[in-house]
Amino acid sequence: MENGEIEGAADDGVPVPAPPNGRRYRPVGSSDRAVIQMTSMEPGSSSSTAVAAVSGITPQPPRNLTVDPSMQEDHTVSQGDSKLELFGFDSLVNILGLKSMTGEQIQAPSSPRDGEDVAITIGRPKETGPKFGTMMGVFVPCLQNILGIIYYIRFTWIVGMAGVWQSLVLVSFCGACTFLTGISLSAIATNGAMKGGGPYYLIGRALGPEVGVSIGLCFFLGNAVAGSMYVLGAVETFLDAVPSAGFFKESVTVVNNTLVNGTATASTATISTPSLHDLQVYGVIVTILLCFIVFGGVKIINKVAPAFLIPVLFSLLCIYLGVFIAPRHNAPKGITGLSITTFKDNWGSEYQRTNNAGVPDPNGSIYWDFNALVGLFFPAVTGIMAGSNRSASLKDTQRSIPIGTLSATLTTTAMYLFSVLLFGALATREELLTDRLLTATVAWPAPAVIYIGIILSTLGAALQSLTGAPRLLAAIANDDILPVLNYFKVSEGAEPHSATLFTAFICICCVVIGNLDLITPTITMFFLLCYAGVNLSCFLLDLLDAPSWRPRWKFHHWSLSLVGALLCVVIMFLISWSFTVVSLALASLIYYYVSLKGKAGDWGDGFKSAYFQLALRSLRSLGANQVHPKNWYPIPLIFCRPWGKLPENVPCHPKLADFANCMKKKGRGMSIFVSIIDGDYHELAEDAKTACRQLDTYIEYKRCEGVAEIIVAPSMSEGFRSIVQTMGLGNLKPNIIVMRYPEIWRRENLIQIPSTFVSIINDCIIANKAVVIVKGLDEWPNEYQRQYGTIDLYWIVRDGGLMLLLSQLLLTKETFESCKIQVFCIAEEDTDAEELKADVKKFLYDLRMHAEVIVVTMKSWEPHMESSSSGAPQDDSQEAYTSAQRRISTYLSEMKETAQREGHPLMEDGKQVVVNEQKIEKFLYTMFKLNSTILRYSRMAAVVLVSLPPPPLNHPAYFYMEYMDLLVENVPRMLIVRGYRRDVVTFFT
């Protein structure tokens, strides 16, 4: 079809049939949003007049596309009105382009390998709820998640334990990690549209499904466990504020050593602490109540969320006001107000033992140091993913996520550093360590304000965790990578109730543990693992710098991402090497499980780009020079269906892949499986795609490392000639052509096979490709059929050692490892057999090959019949020889009669041939003698390898086929081998 023709109807309404070949095009319509509507190409034209001129034609949807009827407009541009009629229009390209732009990555069929049935519903993404800007969409959620329970009930304790200067180092260290992660997150998030799943989506699309799922599940666990941490923090604060609400009472005796007038004195004090059982009971109740809110859906959560944000900001204001006006008249003695003396006393660290509640105790079971404090404090800087988790609700993700995330990170880090200085100068170390809610004690106007603020802020953070974690799990399940997660799948817009129940179960289990200081290191590991994944993703994408890597956030560099990833790993080991090993082992187990059981997925991840660039670099490093024999690998091109006698649903002979595996040492190497379809490419393109998919499935089923290619050509000879010239790149071109011997040609009366067979062999010789023809492929053993006996080589001509190498490769397989190699040297009558045998033995010894050498002397050619002295083998060969003579004589007579009748020289398949009857008899007799020798010595061999004679020039292909038939007659399993003009083995180390 020409570009101007329309698939649909002409101006007069008469349908225009689409031609059988070629793409189907229609003119550009006004409803086609992917192209520019040109409205001013003529004087006086305008968009209004152009639209008014629209009439008549409703374009038909292309094949394999399901078009949403609601999106089909009633008006399109007719053929005569189209200004871009010359260019034509491919609706498939347009639809795929539109879907790609809206974030639905649909692969456009462009080759037989890409061909899939595409079902597309045309339509714009539905608007889902209000959109938020940078402040409310990213900055505030990040701030709310970062400022959590750790700041209120543990930060003053950390300052008292680590001292001012180590607390500053601690905050800077953890803040640098999250800031660098925020830079990496900003770069990835601004490189395209984001879907649900937050960091899982980013990591999975950058590092692949396996890494994405493994880190995503760990991040899900981190969020679920973080919910329990927030619940415990809220309950602990409530019990501290209202001790009478506890069902169980627990007190701790604190021993303080002081120095008075040079004499050490010890003072004891008894303080009440929340009971573990109270934490468990209230924690489970609060978790269940929060789950009821989560089950109410996003609308209820969005209405409740502001109530948890305002108390956070108000409580911070009250804390700072209280710090600056301290001490008040009723303040404890330990609160000195902002004092330089107190600041100096608290400058250094004073690590000591505490009980499970964090109260100093010389006999306590927990000893704190800087590494342990990193694990305790790091959750106070997490929460930077809150904005990316809400990408679907943002007006402009590529602007809001970088600005909002990094602003929240810098704001909280600056606030933490400022708070270290304030708290270090506010109270004595004893007060910092024993008053678990010092922030409430100093707050203005009353501690109750802080208690309420802490409880509401932590419950809000817990609500966010219980809301985000199920959606993360549902996003992983919806990607359909891990079948075991199918239970958590949800339809678009539905609430993930199953995932919410599972998250609540994990949260309740952690609440039952009841120890906040033991839970936080676990959360830290999972969050650090996720942050390391984000940094590694940006590092890989930045380093590869693929054409698709064009983030709008320009302030990034691969070195910053690498430093961020290393910081994450260092912090993990600083906290606890045992927790680190466990978390990495868990992620590795999930990775292995996904790679083993997960479904295949290609998200265009960075690893694929890395493999591509590595392959290009390796290919360039190989150069165009010949590979040294020490580095030579067989790259077989497997000719799958050369003679066309397999069922249509069988893409390749079942034993060809078994034989291809036998040509590789320990599976190293690559095979190229090729099949040729006779016909016109435009007509058979879809058939080629289907055949390619079937062949790919066959290769995967046979566990053979190889690729499938389907070629459509007018004839098998032309198709093979194209393959042998163009297949492969540089030194990765196939060097061995493997195909089945056409045993069926005479039985099926396929008279075209001889000429095709000869043409293929001649093409291989001209292209300098080795040839391996397998006779008896139906009887070729699989990997479970062990063979015994010998592998016999009939070494007639020098082939660069290919035949010897093939025999050694066969021995490396379990099927043939029990066999021994015998080398038969075919010598003329006047050759010194013993000298030849010694030379061959020395040659094999230098090649590190173990084989028995046998010299067979054949009499010079004499056109006479010999009597058999060895019984059946000679009789079998004799019968085949006589039959071949008779068929050749008949065929030659017919050729002569045809040439005489039509008055032209001897012709075969339209080509002139030269017939020398004496040479024909000589060639035939040589094959007879060789076949007789093979049957005499190697009838029971596991495999026989023999040299392939090249087709004589201008010789009838039918005669050559008769020679080959006589050679392989009655030999059950044979490899006919022809090397090429180079060595594949070497003496040297």
Curated annotation (Swiss-Prot):
<feature type="transmembrane region" description="Helical">
    <location>
        <begin position="579"/>
        <end position="599"/>
    </location>
</feature>
<feature type="topological domain" description="Extracellular">
    <location>
        <begin position="154"/>
        <end position="167"/>
    </location>
</feature>
<dbReference type="GO" id="GO:0015379">
    <property type="term" value="F:potassium:chloride symporter activity"/>
</dbReference>
<feature type="topological domain" description="Cytoplasmic">
    <location>
        <begin position="302"/>
        <end position="304"/>
    </location>
</feature>
<keyword id="KW-0813">Transport</keyword>
<feature type="region of interest" description="Disordered">
    <location>
        <begin position="1"/>
        <end position="29"/>
    </location>
</feature>
<feature type="topological domain" description="Extracellular">
    <location>
        <begin position="236"/>
        <end position="280"/>
    </location>
</feature>
<feature type="transmembrane region" description="Helical">
    <location>
        <begin position="305"/>
        <end position="325"/>
    </location>
</feature>
<feature type="transmembrane region" description="Helical">
    <location>
        <begin position="406"/>
        <end position="426"/>
    </location>
</feature>
<keyword id="KW-0630">Potassium</keyword>
<feature type="glycosylation site" description="N-linked (GlcNAc...) asparagine">
    <location>
        <position position="256"/>
    </location>
</feature>
<feature type="transmembrane region" description="Helical">
    <location>
        <begin position="168"/>
        <end position="188"/>
    </location>
</feature>
<feature type="compositionally biased region" description="Acidic residues">
    <location>
        <begin position="1"/>
        <end position="10"/>
    </location>
</feature>
<feature type="topological domain" description="Extracellular">
    <location>
        <begin position="520"/>
        <end position="522"/>
    </location>
</feature>
<dbReference type="GO" id="GO:0016020">
    <property type="term" value="C:membrane"/>
</dbReference>
<keyword id="KW-0325">Glycoprotein</keyword>
<comment type="function">
    <text>Probable cation/chloride cotransporter that may mediate potassium-chloride cotransport. Involved in plant development and K(+) and Cl(-) homeostasis. May not be involved in sodium-chloride cotransport.</text>
</comment>
<feature type="topological domain" description="Cytoplasmic">
    <location>
        <begin position="463"/>
        <end position="498"/>
    </location>
</feature>
<feature type="topological domain" description="Cytoplasmic">
    <location>
        <begin position="387"/>
        <end position="405"/>
    </location>
</feature>
<dbReference type="InterPro" id="IPR018491">
    <property type="entry name" value="SLC12_C"/>
</dbReference>
<feature type="topological domain" description="Extracellular">
    <location>
        <begin position="573"/>
        <end position="578"/>
    </location>
</feature>
<dbReference type="InterPro" id="IPR004842">
    <property type="entry name" value="SLC12A_fam"/>
</dbReference>
<keyword id="KW-0812">Transmembrane</keyword>
<keyword id="KW-0769">Symport</keyword>
<dbReference type="GO" id="GO:0006821">
    <property type="term" value="P:chloride transport"/>
</dbReference>
<feature type="transmembrane region" description="Helical">
    <location>
        <begin position="366"/>
        <end position="386"/>
    </location>
</feature>
<dbReference type="Pfam" id="PF00324">
    <property type="entry name" value="AA_permease"/>
</dbReference>
<feature type="topological domain" description="Extracellular">
    <location>
        <begin position="326"/>
        <end position="365"/>
    </location>
</feature>
<keyword id="KW-0633">Potassium transport</keyword>
<feature type="glycosylation site" description="N-linked (GlcNAc...) asparagine">
    <location>
        <position position="261"/>
    </location>
</feature>
<feature type="transmembrane region" description="Helical">
    <location>
        <begin position="442"/>
        <end position="462"/>
    </location>
</feature>
<dbReference type="Pfam" id="PF03522">
    <property type="entry name" value="SLC12"/>
</dbReference>
<comment type="similarity">
    <text>Belongs to the SLC12A transporter family.</text>
</comment>
<feature type="topological domain" description="Cytoplasmic">
    <location>
        <begin position="544"/>
        <end position="551"/>
    </location>
</feature>
<feature type="transmembrane region" description="Helical">
    <location>
        <begin position="281"/>
        <end position="301"/>
    </location>
</feature>
<keyword id="KW-0406">Ion transport</keyword>
<protein>
    <recommendedName>
        <fullName>Cation-chloride cotransporter 1</fullName>
    </recommendedName>
</protein>
<feature type="transmembrane region" description="Helical">
    <location>
        <begin position="133"/>
        <end position="153"/>
    </location>
</feature>
<keyword id="KW-0472">Membrane</keyword>
<feature type="topological domain" description="Cytoplasmic">
    <location>
        <begin position="1"/>
        <end position="132"/>
    </location>
</feature>
<feature type="topological domain" description="Cytoplasmic">
    <location>
        <begin position="189"/>
        <end position="214"/>
    </location>
</feature>
<feature type="glycosylation site" description="N-linked (GlcNAc...) asparagine">
    <location>
        <position position="363"/>
    </location>
</feature>
